[in-house]
Amino acid sequence: VDEERFRTDRQEMSVSGGVEGLQNSHRGRSPEELFAWWRDGAQELAHAALSVDLSKRCAWYGPSMSARSMLTARLMETWAHGLDIADAVGESLTPTDRLIHVAHIGVRAMGFAFVTNGRTAPDEEVFVELLAPSGETWTWGSPNASSSVRGSAYGFCCAVTQRRHVNDCGLTVTGNVAREWMSIAQAFAGPPGSGRAEGQFS
């Protein structure tokens, strides 16, 4: 892991237009070239991940985070943007139990979702119960909590990555805290996302 190179790249990106500047610099590439570029980067990341201490703090574009959290976030982003691509070309993604990583970061980001929307993060716990693609049940929190979110793992992941409007995700949301959370749920870093319109993909 070359942290010095990352810091240099981060500095260059900050003065060259950020993500939008990066996008513009690649707009002339063919789909095949873009895919090869992405694949090379993904393989480099996977190779680096094999040797990193998962508890080690890693520099990032936002606050530093543990290597484990950073890699989980990359899985979440890859899945979410993969769904964007599938939507754009009229295809669908087959859900797998690897969605547990996306769901986990979505649950862990509940407090962040409130803060980034200028709200106070609640002390109250929310129970989350999801049906995995394999039929297994995943849970977070206490089943005795007064607020809960239940449904499919796929629907929950679509909601917390804002790839579908929460009302289109087939979730059962009970309690004031859970309802408020799911209206602003955001697993990704940065300012509040614009999300998707209700019924946009129906």
Segments (PLM) and residue ranges:
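Structured surface interface patches that mediate subunit assembly and partner/cofactor docking
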Residues: 2-12, 27-28, 36, 51-202
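A short, structured beta-strand-centered segment in the mid-to-C-terminal lobe
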Residues: 20-41
